[in-house]
């Protein structure tokens, strides 16, 4: 079987990188005349064994660029996030729906040797293999990098873990909040004199997903240059520590321990949220000119030439006194009044929006950040759309997140060329499962 799978993989690799087919382009079988109308990853197949957030976020972004994402799930259970609610829409959680568009779901029991065989056969005809199991878990099933590399040396194998492949805590399960704590993010998040706070969205997971997405794109370019695949080690801890940015540099270079600042900034004053008569506004003055403009808008011109506030260094040193003056002034007017006064000033500013206001924000709507699609069982749904737009292809059309096992039979037939009898036997044995839509 291994020899057969290797031959299939070699044939696919040759077709992908030779551009053979008379006027056909890289990655796709479309005529050259259509090349400006396709997404860059059309023709690329992603075998996705991830669940929860970091991995699915990475593969969703790849799917947005045209890749065919085959999502492998456990029969009868599926991705953990399918049950993470409320809220639910029909039987689907909105959490799951938020990060799984543009995918096909195949339900396979990978604890069964026949299920392992299916995964290996899929790997042989895919370009990318993504998983987020604890290190060694898939190797014990015969699906580790060495196992897949033997039959598909072209494969980009991306492993997403909590803490890395090796090391003293590499065998721990990794969840966003825990990695956020270990990495220091939670230590620097929260009110100045209060307890550490978990960020309102799972930024460690999302940052890891973006790192994995970028690494996979780099892997595809590397494969284009060399014809060979590679292994990618991506983890929550490394991703978040790398994102500590200047906070980490303050400690590593300046030996300055970090602290919590609430909405304020440790090195820039003023740069924080201010309470208004009816809400909050965030204002930032990153230089002396912007600070002078803030003072004029607040009708506090006497602060501009005050020797205690003439430079950012002095403003940081005299933070408490200055913020008290500014805060008292901001509380005298409605948020809408301040938004009107700051408009066109050149000073960065904005309201603190709840979700209702976010998705009523004209710029959010203009940027196309609400994506609508037709779900097979619940009808029209809306999810956050892609953050990036491209001039040569559109991101507006998307397939809805799949039902559990919705595409099992389709993938076995169309991708692996199984016949009806073989598929029926696998279904009867519980190796695979097919969701029937009505």
Curated annotation (Swiss-Prot):
It is an enzyme of class 2 (transferase). Gene3D superfamilies: Crotonobetainyl-coa:carnitine coa-transferase, domain 1, formyl-coa transferase, domain 3. It is linked to Glutaric aciduria 3: An autosomal recessive metabolic condition characterized by urinary excretion of abnormal quantities of glutaric acid, in the presence of normal 3-hydroxyglutarate, glutarylcarnitine and glutarylglycine urinary levels. Affected individuals show no consistent clinical phenotype and many are asymptomatic. SUPFAM superfamilies: CoA-transferase family III (CaiB/BaiF). Changing residue 205 to A: Loss of CoA transferase activity toward glutaryl-CoA and 3-hydroxy-3-methylglutarate substrates. Belongs to the CoA-transferase III family. Keywords: Acetylation, Disease variant, Glutaricaciduria, Mitochondrion, Transferase, Transit peptide. GO terms for molecular function: succinate-hydroxymethylglutarate CoA-transferase activity. Highly expressed in kidney. Intermediate expression in liver, skeletal muscle and pancreas. Little to no expression detected in other tissues examined. InterPro entries: CoA-transferase_III_domain, CoA-Trfase_fam_III, CoA-Trfase_III_dom3_sf, CoA-Trfase_III_dom_1_sf. The keyword Oxidoreductase does not apply. It is found in: Mitochondrion. It catalyses: glutarate + succinyl-CoA = glutaryl-CoA + succinate; 3-hydroxy-3-methylglutarate + succinyl-CoA = (3S)-3-hydroxy-3-methylglutaryl-CoA + succinate; 3-hydroxy-3-methylglutarate + glutaryl-CoA = (3S)-3-hydroxy-3-methylglutaryl-CoA + glutarate; hexanedioate + glutaryl-CoA = hexanedioyl-CoA + glutarate. The lineage of its organism: Eukaryota, Metazoa, Chordata, Craniata, Vertebrata. The gene is SUGCT. GO terms for cellular component: mitochondrion. Its EC number is 2.8.3.-, 2.8.3.13. This is Succinyl-CoA:glutarate CoA-transferase. Residues 1-31 form a transit peptide. Inhibited by valsartan and losartan carboxylate. Its main location: mitochondrion. Transmembrane segments: none annotated. The modification N6-acetyllysine is found at residue 394. Coenzyme A (CoA) transferase that reversibly catalyzes the transfer of a CoA moiety from a dicarboxyl-CoA to a dicarboxylate in a metabolite recycling process. Displays preference for succinyl-CoA and glutarate-CoA as dicarboxyl-CoA donors and glutarate, succinate, adipate/hexanedioate, itaconate and 3-hydroxy-3-methylglutarate as dicarboxylate acceptors. Acts on intermediates or end products of lysine and tryptophan degradation pathway, in particular catalyzes succinyl-CoA-dependent reesterification of free glutarate into glutaryl-CoA to prevent renal excretion of glutarate. The active site is at 205 (nucleophile).
